[in-house]
Structure formats: structure tokens, C-alpha cells
Amino acid sequence: MDKPYPVRHTEEEWRRLLTPEQYQVMRGHGTEAPGSCALLREKRAGRFSCAACAQPLFDSKRKFESGTGWPSFDDPIEGALETSIDRSFDMVRTEVHCANCGSHLGHVFDDGPPPTGLRYCINGVALNFTPT
């Protein structure tokens, strides 16, 4: 995360701003346990935003049930996300992070529903939800 994102903090500041689990996932590129987040079952109309900087990321209309245990979306809000290649665990995946603060959110896969065919598999602990 060497890129100068609009929202920047020292690692010490991030540790103060985030819960230990959020820090481990969002700054340490971790993954929460599947099925562990209440946002997995969130069905109300609203918007999902970055838990680290409040950047709007996904509209609830783009959320779908993937059966994976993590909140899944087929299309982000334009300009909200950036991607990079993740080569950890002897795999090659596309990592998704917040375009505003660089925090790790999850991964994107090409096995989602039409029309995008994409599945943004996002750690629920990295999200906040605001109903509309």
C-alpha cells in the first residue's frame, strides 16, 4: 500500500481507528471466518461503505446470495475500488481494496451472476451499512 491514497494514516493511527479484527483484515490483508458477519444477511435497501474511511462502495441492489459465507456483490460504485494481483497461498487472485484509503476488502472472481459475471467477495468486517 505504497500508493498515496486520499485518506492516509500511520499504522499506529490505523490500529487506534479500527477494531483488532478490522485491522487484521483491512490492513493485514486477512480474511474473516465465513458466515461470521451480520452483514452477510443484510437485506435492507441502502449502501455499503468502507469501515476504515466511509467511502461508499456498493449499493445494496448489487448484493446477492453467493453461498460462500461472505457478503457478495456483482458491481461496485464507479471509482470506489481498485484491484491488484494477490499471489498469497500459492494462488493467483484479484484483490479488491478501497480506492480512497487502500484498505483490503476482499477479492473479485469471474463466477458471478449476469450481467457482470463478477462476484466481489467482501469481508463483512470491512464494511459499514447505512439503510436508505
Each PLM stretch: what is its role?
Residues 5-132:
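A short Gly-Trp-Pro
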